[in-house]
Structures are given as structure tokens and as C-alpha cells.
Amino acid sequence: LGINGKVLRIFDKRTQQKFALKMLQDCPKARREVELHWRASQCPHIVDIVDVYENLYAGRKCLLIVMECLDGGELFSRIQDRGDQAFTEREASEIMKSIGEAIQYLHSINIAHRDVKPENLLYTSKRPNAILKLTDFGFAKETTSHNSLTTPCYTPYYVAPEVLGPEKYDKSCDMWSLGVIMYILLCGYPPFYSNHGLAISPGMKTRIRMGQYEFPNPEWSEVSEEVKMLIRNLLKTEPTQRMTITEFMNHPWIMQSTKVPQTPLHTSRVLKEDKERWEDVKEEMTSALATMRVDYEQIKIKKIEDASNPLLLKRRKKARAVEAAALAH
């Protein structure tokens, strides 16, 4: 039994109805996950918990969480598999509205999800009218004032800048993830990437922390400046400057999604062409998740004055020599 739990497909013998079963080793963390997920599952865009059982498995106490079965697959797989039919800006807007509704509900009841990423966004069925739902509350946390978030648990391509440094972070972490997902929806690739095929390289860390990304053509040539500005407001490196979920939901591109132009996007083609890389990215993210959830206590970033950077030492030495020479004259 893993700490984050394995999900199995099960069915009701009486009705033949399908469900998803998540097994968690019984511990305070697991109970917290179940409690927060249960509280949130009233939202139509969050996977519903049907029942929770305590049991013994291989002699260990465990929790069995019975949830609705989401048969429609992952968000980006669905866009990838759509054939020749172009994915449009209006569809991207409608998808972002659905995800926004889930986050809005969570934030309104003081819960931060902290792991909003495409793999945790699943459709209820393969039908065109299927509902997109947010899953996996393994890293969700209550965000009351006495309990600000201090544990980094993240997936490289969707990790907010403040998770990489020692600053505290809160609901704005989810907003940053929304920005990354929106960016991918509109072009088919992430705004931050590793040049070396590593899950999270030093260069990528720097780009994330500095908020360095572009809107390259041809993929972005037809996307309006208003939409790019919305992404910029979600990807702000300073959490306090980042858009809140209320501001996001009130933005015309989200609020009036039916009026958004049906501009064909490159997303589906790019995702198809990069299918192998996309799978690698997901694998990297999964393995990186296991290794990167470190306690903030272990992250100590030295002040620049105390840093023993050889380049800085060289510069300081040179500066002192220049100063000494000037004084001598």
C-alpha cells in the first residue's frame, strides 16, 4: 500500500455499476486527504466520493475510498485523440472554466489542491457532453490563517515559483497551475521545459523562478493579447500579485466563454507530434513527485552575503583589490 494510494476499477455486484476504489494506508495524512476530499466532493467538477471504509489489508489498517468512476480519460489525451477536427480557442475557454469552477469551490471552503495538473483532470465518459473533473487530493491542505502552506509537493512542469524557494505559498499555487494548463491548452507544449530531458533541471528552475517564457509563433499568432495577458496574470512569480480565482472566473474570456471566437489552434497537432515526449514528461513528473516532496525545514537558501559561490568570491576579491589600490593612491 503506497502512501498516495493505488486506484482500482471495481463494480457493484448487484447493479453492475462501475466505481473507482482508492486504497490508502490508514494514517493521519490519509484521513486528512479523505476529509478534505469528502468536503469538496459536493462540487460538480470534483470527483465524487461515494463511501469510505476502514479495513485490514495484509494485516495493515487501511482506508478504502469508493469514488465515481471517470471513464473518459485524461484531458490532454482527449485533445490528442480527436483526429482531424481542430481544437478551438472557445473549447479551451470552456475547459478552463470547468477547472476554474473546481478551484473556486475549493478556495471558497479554504482548501488548496496543490497538485493541479493535466493527469488529475479526467472526463466522466467518452461522450462529447462528458464533464471534466479534478481528482487526487493527496496533497490538498486547509488554508486557514493559522495554517499557511509550508510543504513543497509538486510536479515539475506545473510547479509554482514559490515552491522552489523557501517562501510560504497558498491558494495562488493553484492559480499558477491554471496558467500552465491554459498555456498548454492554447498551444500544445508547456511554458517551462527542461533542455536536458531531466524532470527539473537547474535551467528550468531558473526560468520558473524568473517567470521566463514566451508566446512563440506560429502557435500563438492567432491568440489574442487579452488571453496572453490572462496567462501573464496567472504566471506572475510574486504570489501576492497573482490573479485570484474570483478575478479569473470574472474575466470575460472565462465568464463569456460562449462569445470566445472559435479560432482553430495548433494544440491537437502539437500534442500528437510530441506524443512520445508528452508521455516522457508525464513519467518524469510521476517519478519526480516521489523524490521532490521535501520538507521545507530541509530547504535552506543562504543569504547572498553568506554564499560561498566561487564566482562571487572571485568578484569580491577583485573589488577589494581595486578598493585597496584606490586607497593607496
Curated annotation (Swiss-Prot):
Positions occupied by motif Nuclear export signal (NES): 285-294
Activity control: Activated following phosphorylation by p38-alpha/MAPK14 following various stresses. Inhibited following sumoylation. Specifically inhibited by pyrrolopyridine inhibitors.
Superkingdom of the source species: Eukaryota
EC number of the protein: 2.7.11.1
Residue ranges occupied by any Protein kinase domain in the UniProt entry: 1-254
InterPro entries, sorted: Kinase-like_dom_sf (IPR011009), MAPKAPK_C (IPR027442), Prot_kinase_dom (IPR000719), Ser/Thr_kinase_AS (IPR008271)
Motif (Bipartite nuclear localization signal 1): 300-303
Region (p38 MAPK-binding site): 295-319
Similarity comment: Belongs to the protein kinase superfamily. CAMK Ser/Thr protein kinase family.
Protein name from the UniProt record: MAP kinase-activated protein kinase 2
Organism: Cricetulus longicaudatus (Long-tailed dwarf hamster)
Upper classification of the organism: Eukaryota, Metazoa, Chordata, Craniata, Vertebrata
Name of the coding gene: MAPKAPK2
